[in-house]
Structure formats: C-alpha cells, structure tokens
C-alpha cells in the first residue's frame, strides 16, 4: 500500500475517532406519550433557587462532603484520593455550588399532589462536623413535626466507598393514612469540567438506564432544543420498575441506584418515575420519584436510595448495579473498547504498570494480526521492488492511461502482486486504534497513572512532546520502507504527513501515542525483515510466492 492510502486510512480513523458523535449524534430519547403528558406539582419545588447553605462537613477516607443543614442537600463532594485536573496539590472536587459551577444532589418528600411537604421548614443536625472512625458514619437531619409527620433524613457514608445511602425515616402521627413519595435529584449547570479540549472532549450530561429503554444519554443540547422550540416543558419522562440515572463527565459520575446488584428495587410499591429536564432557572435536573407504600396512622416507614458519586472504575461500578459500567463513556465503540480495556486491565494486574501493560497489549495485538499483516506487508515489499518497472511503464505510455493501466495490471500479474494487499494492515488496525483510543481516554484507571520518567499521566498528553516526536520519526522511517510514490506531489505529501500527524498527536493521551509508537516500531521491524528477504530472493533470481 502506498503512503497515499496509508494517509487516507489514518485520516479516516482520526475523523471517526474524534468526530463520530458530531457526525452521528445519539438519537434523541423519545419518552412514552402517556408518560410525557404527565404533570406534577413537584416542578415548582424542584426549580426553587439554591438557598445559601449552612454547612455540615463529613470526612471519610475517600470523600469530604458538605451537606446543607436546612435543605439536606449534598452541596459539595471532594474526592480525596483523586487530584484535581492540572493541579496535583489539590483534591478533585465533583459536587459544588460556588461561583464556578453548580452540581448538587437533592432529595425531598412529596405528598400525593407532588408538593414538597418540608418546603420552607428545614432540618437541623446535632453537630456540624462528622468524621469516619469505624466502617460507617451517619448524619441524621431532623425536621420539626409537620402535619403530624416526624421526618428524619439520614446520610450514611461507608469506609473505602463512594456510595452514600440517603434515607428518609418517617413516623406518621397524623391520625390518617399518609401517601408519600421520595424525590431524588442530581442538579447541575452546563459548565464544562476541567480538562475538556477538542481532542480530549467527552460527553457531559444526564444518563439513564432502564430495562425498557436500555442505556441512553439525554444531552443538554437536546433539552435546550426542546426549551427553545417553545415547549412548556423540556424533559424526558419514563416510568420504570428499576434502573439508575444521573450525570456523567470525563472519568467521574453521580447516579441514583434504584436497585443494587443482587438486591431489591426501591420501586417495590409501584413504578418509579424518571424525569430529566432543563429547568426554568436553566439548571438541568435528573430526578426519580419513588412511590412509598401507604403509611397508616401511628405507623413508621423508611425509604432509602444509594447515591454513587465517584470515579468510573470498572471493577467497582460493575458490582454496584446491573449495567452501571455502561456509564463509562466509550462512545459508539463500547462493544470493542470494553474488551480491549478488560485485556489491558488483566495485563496491568500481572505487570503492575499501565504503561508497560499498553506495550504488552500492543505486542499481543500485533501477534494476533501477524498472519494477515505479513501477507500484506509482503505485497507492499513486492510493490516497492517493482517500483522501477512501474516508473518505466509510466514513462513509456505517457498520457495513454488505458495502455498504462493494462501494462501495470500485467506487471502485477507477472510479479504476483496484489495492488490492494497493503490496505489490509491499516483496515485491521483502525478498529483497534479507535477502540484503544476510547479505552485509554475514558478509563479513570489510567488517570494520573505513570509509566516511566516524564510520563506521569497516561490519560493526558505528553508534557514534553517526546513520544509524538518519536512517533514522527517512526512514521518517517516507514515511508522509506513503503513503495515510493511515482507522483512528485505524493512524494512531497509522503514527507509532510508524518509531521502533520505527529503535531495532532501532541494533544492525544500519552498512552495512545505510546501504543502507536510501539506499533510503528514493530511494523518497521517486520517490514524491514520482509523487504530484506524479498530483495535477497530477487537477487538470487527466485520467484517469490
């Protein structure tokens, strides 16, 4: 395959990898008509402005949480084991309600008409500081008795976990049956998380999984379009007996879990109602309303939902809820990126270093493809050896394209050359390249994972551009092993394109560039060996099969 084809295939891979979501956006979820028509008075409560917070601080080994004492909202969540993007001296902050962005978790109880029964009343807690000393730490927020109902909101944080259990304890002293539901929400604005860029841009926004609708992204842009179209409400509504919903961003997520893996669904009293929308205050809400069984006079009841707010670590989230690992955004190539990451993870478990695991994975992929690529590289070597004869044909027939093509086809037949044979290696590598790109880009396991020396974060670009420069050198070396173009313009492009691609790779994750460098080095060794073998055979006058 000549360099023109190589360039074309490489460009196609980059376009698919980077621009797939823009070229083929995820179809907009269409809620069931009867569900979309439903209205609840909870809307007004849900869209109330975030009031100033009276903070309660909870510190565990994994997180530092700030809860608003009055509303009971989880207003700030710092992940203590992860460093901030671009600032290793600070921990990563997931939730926040400051000037820079709004991203909070809310929960409340609704009456039969959908009204927040504690609106304007507020909770209180016995103290303002909580620290994990055992396996769990509990924060109990108590509200004044309202219409005969005594309500506590209880947060339970667990050691070495990013799961937070949010429970309502209800005592009905009203003398009549209480019909309530609990509403759990993730609310955020449209601000871009730190570290987003053109080559490092990932989906940010609501996600939902239900058995009926499977996994879906409900993008901010779709909700914005609904709002701009003049609809009275811009939202996605669905009823479901189980599932999960929330918000995701690069490497991190926050989701309400309706059914823990191997456990019972919180929707046992009736289908839960999922509602994802853009609110009138231009914040975005992903909420679920959980119906409670009727609470008889004098009886007590509780309802609890787990909130997972933390990293998208595959081995962790896969054990929290069914299909929660789908929230790890591999784009359109999840079917290929997921098994690639599984293999990479197995190698890491053995080797103990993600960088060397990538090197070994590259060798394995190269070995698997060897039987096919070897025949293709031999075809390229034959084409290279036949280049002088091709030039002679071009000079002999000049502008007579028909005669020139006939002579070239006869030469290919005589020399046993498949002119398309060289395309196969690149075609085979494109899905691997794209799949590995997303596997490396989306996996929080590689976030701030070192390889050696100057590479301290395989998920981010090489800070000194050493790997991209090495990659450019390997691409230049490959051009001399490929059949030389007879067209002067192609010859110039052959020298320029390695530089162009290496500049593009300045912005790619170092782990991906490492894969491509190792792959190029292996390819160079393979092509050099084949070229030398064929040249030796031709010098001896042998016919190469």
Curated annotation (Swiss-Prot):
Its membrane topology: Multi-pass membrane protein
UniProt cross-references to InterPro entries, sorted A to Z: Membr_insert_YidC, Membr_insert_YidC_N, YidC/ALB3/OXA1/COX18, YidC/Oxa/ALB_C, YidC_ALB_C, YidC_periplasmic_sf
Keyword Membrane: yes
One cellular component term from this protein's GO annotations in UniProt: plasma membrane
Subcellular location: Cell inner membrane
UniProt keyword annotations, A-Z: Cell inner membrane, Cell membrane, Chaperone, Membrane, Protein transport, Transmembrane, Transmembrane helix, Transport
Transmembrane segments: 350-370, 424-444, 461-481, 498-518
Function: Required for the insertion and/or proper folding and/or complex formation of integral membrane proteins into the membrane. Involved in integration of membrane proteins that insert both dependently and independently of the Sec translocase complex, as well as at least some lipoproteins. Aids folding of multispanning membrane proteins.
Oligomeric and partner information: Interacts with the Sec translocase complex via SecD. Specifically interacts with transmembrane segments of nascent integral membrane proteins during membrane integration.
Name of the protein this chain belongs to: Membrane protein insertase YidC
Name of the gene: yidC
